[in-house]
Amino acid sequence: IRNLFILLYQFNIFKRIVPSILRKLSLFKKSQTVSLENFKMNLHFKSSIDREIYLKNHYESKQINFLTSQFELEKIDLFLDIGSYIGYYSLFLYNKIQNIYAFEPNSENYKKLKKNILINNFKIKTFNCACSNFDGESKIWYTDVNKLGGSSVFDENDKEIEKYDFKKILFEKINVSKLDNLIKVVKKKIIIKIDVERHELIVLQGAIKLIKNNNIFLQIEIFDSRKKIILDYLIENGF
């Protein structure tokens, strides 16, 4: 039945219909474990990201193909998946590198990340925390329990939260840590993927020693409006 849904989803006329069917069919009320290219994932169909993976058999193809190409250029010592969600990047790249650290602060996402690693019998090191510029506690916020991939670390300067009815915003207390205090290596070739919903600069501020003391390739998912501040910070610190 999955192959039928994948086939239908390729046609524009079915792009919106098929995900709706998945949400409503009793068959898809619970999670399902599906086989992808070289790994398995347990997917939850109330999540739009999980439905996309189920229907396309892949996720963020352009970004991950570009990232994969970097592993083919030279030997990489370590991959850091910051903002791992339920682990797609880490699982996909495991056949390229087995030394992977995955970071995910949201407790529900983290449980799913751990489950996906377990069903593949992969040895990926996980951290249930957000990367930050200090060690301690903070909180994340989100507005929909079915869209936890968009969880954001709370920042009083982040205007995005003002777009929502404060009464409907959900908060969760989390641990935060500086990458510099978690990973102490030098002269290594490291690829870092960062997808942290406007928290990018804070992550980089807590990883400045790691960046300066190693050969780093960064792939950051970022809004156009935030590109300059990130690039300026990296240039100022010799990246």
Tell where the protein language model's regions lie, with residue ranges.
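Phosphate/nucleotide-binding beta-alpha loop and adjacent structural elements of enzyme active sites
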Residues: 1-239
